[in-house]
Amino acid sequence: MHYPSGQWTIWCAESRPFETVVSERLKVFIAAGYETVVIGDNMIGFCIAQKKVNAVFVFYQHVTNEHACCQGGGLLVAVLAKELGVACNLYPTDFDSEKAATGDSLCFAGHNITPLGSHSYIPGADRVALSYFKERW
């Protein structure tokens, strides 16, 4: 399938704890003439269910015979897309969330939102079964 600029809008979920990476990724699409919309990661299911998207792309670092190593949150996106009948595709990235330092606090807009004395769980990568994906780009 071909997604020509000027005819498609890209909805991109911010991706804590790496929200600054989204900005870098979208610059390429904006420069190519795509309209882009950044949504909160909790809005993914709503946007898919409301048929605001025609296809979903999940960034991956590498693939084995059984699964793709995707950026954290990729499993949720793949499950939602499959359940709601929207094609989910794999798209390569050189960003390696398995090696990226996540620290032990959860940030939003660059600020720590973890209360003092608490901990957070921040998975860097998801292993997603290949059966969830329609195509690998």
Region roles according to the model:
Residues M1-R25:
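Catalytic core of membrane glycerolipid acyltransferases/transacylases, capturing the structured
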Residues R16-W137:
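Conserved phosphate- and dinucleotide-binding cores of soluble alpha/beta proteins
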